[in-house]
């Protein structure tokens, strides 16, 4: 098991290295410059480039950046003068993590309940409704769902605050919007697993022993369907990471996703680089946890 974990960890570290390298050099070929103020004189522009180390050869900039990265130094923002990037991320990351956690919990719980109900009423009306919601959650981007929720629940019905962060009511609409994707994935997975479980021999044996239908479904079929669901952590985390970027912008949430969107047109390379790395590390942690849980549930994957 230890050998398997070390192997997976090594592959993830290699992937992270490639992401850092590709992102760094992609930043260099992006058109434009963060110092595009027409009021800057050539001398002032040279001073700024020297201050941020942009006058050094590209290969030297790369090795300096990688060396600083391992010490947690992501440089300072080009736009927010003298503001360390690591400080900016530390202030906003908890907001994004809270939003993602709430959406993951809500989506998982609702998905498990909907999948259970769909399996028990296979091909029925409820199964059709939940199936439609699952297709909606998988096929429609979260920012489209978020926009519709904002227009209907926020502007038309005025049920919740339309923007900001700080109170529980402000988290409701973005959490619902972001939870659609994990809800859809879990619903389809639990439905499929439970339909298979309900027709298995051990379920027939449980019914033959006189157990109530509630006990058969909850203690046997549902429980055995939820164990393999641990393998979905990685894909759902990826969906939440990519979906939260625009959701934060739509609902004016002060998370790293909104900061990332703002930094792109501003050509704030240190913020873009650091945010990309943070997203990659978070995703890789989820993938590693998923791989470990999968290896525990199914030892064959270690081979």
UniProtKB/Swiss-Prot annotation:
Phenotype caused by lack of the gene: Inactivation of the gene impairs growth on low concentrations of di-valine.
- Statement: the UniProt record of this protein carries the keyword Transmembrane: yes
Q: So where does this one cross the membrane? A: 9-29, 62-82, 93-113, 129-149, 166-186, 227-247, 269-289
Task: Tell me the InterPro entries matching this sequence.
Answer: BPD_transp_1_N, MetI-like, MetI-like_sf
A cellular component annotation (GO) from this entry: plasma membrane
Q: Where in the cell is it found?
A: Cell membrane
What are the record keywords, sorted?
Answer: Cell membrane, Membrane, Peptide transport, Protein transport, Transmembrane, Transmembrane helix, Transport
Question: Which processes are annotated in GO (biological process)?
Answer: peptide transport; protein transport; transmembrane transport
User: Does the UniProt entry include the keyword Cell membrane?
Assistant: yes
A Pfam cross-reference name: BPD_transp_1_N
The entry sums up its family as follows: Belongs to the binding-protein-dependent transport system permease family. OppBC subfamily.
What job does the chain carry out?
Answer: Part of the ABC transporter DppABCDF involved in dipeptide transport. Responsible for the translocation of the substrate across the membrane.
- Which proteins does it associate with, and in what oligomeric form? The complex is composed of two ATP-binding proteins (DppD and DppF), two transmembrane proteins (DppB and DppC) and a solute-binding protein (DppA).
UniProt-recorded name of the protein:
Dipeptide transport system permease protein DppB
Gene source species: Lactococcus lactis subsp. cremoris (strain MG1363)
Q: Tell me the gene name.
A: dppB
């Amino acid at each position: 098991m230890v050998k398997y974990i070390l192997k997976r960890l090594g592959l993830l570290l290699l992937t992270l290295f490639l992401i850092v390298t590709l992102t760094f050099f992609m930043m260099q070929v992006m058109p434009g410059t963060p110092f595009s103020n027409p009021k800057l004189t050539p001398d002032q522009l040279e001073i700024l480039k020297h201050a941020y180390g942009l006058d050094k050869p590209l290969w030297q900039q790369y090795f300096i950046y990688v060396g600083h990265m391992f010490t947690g130094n992501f440089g300072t923002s080009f736009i927010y003068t003298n503001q360390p990037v690591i400080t900016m991320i530390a202030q906003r990351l908890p907001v994004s993590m809270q939003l993602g956690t709430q959406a993951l919990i809500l989506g998982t719980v609702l998905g498990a309940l909907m999948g259970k109900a769909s399996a028990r009423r296979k091909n029925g009306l409820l199964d059709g409704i939940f199936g439609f919601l699952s297709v909606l959650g998988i096929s429609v981007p979260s920012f489209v769902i978020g926009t519709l929720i904002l227009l209907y629940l926020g502007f038309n019905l005025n049920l919740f605050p339309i923007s900001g962060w700080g109170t529980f009511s402000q988290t409701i609409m973005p959490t619902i919007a972001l939870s659609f994707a994990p809800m859809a994935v879990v619903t389809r997975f639990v439905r499929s697993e439970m339909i298979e479980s309900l027709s298995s021999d051990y379920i027939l044996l449980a019914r033959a022993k006189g157990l109530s239908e509630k006990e058969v479904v909850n203690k046997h079929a549902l429980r055995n369907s939820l164990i393999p669901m641990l393998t979905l952590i990685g894909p759902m985390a990826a969906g939440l990471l990519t979906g939260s970027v625009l959701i934060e912008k739509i609902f004016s949430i002060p998370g790293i996703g909104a900061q990332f969107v703002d930094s792109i047109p501003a050509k704030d390379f240190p913020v873009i680089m650091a945010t990309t790395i943070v997203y990659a590390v978070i995703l890789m942690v989820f993938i590693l946890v998923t791989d470990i849980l999968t290896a525990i549930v199914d030892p064959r994957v270690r081979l």
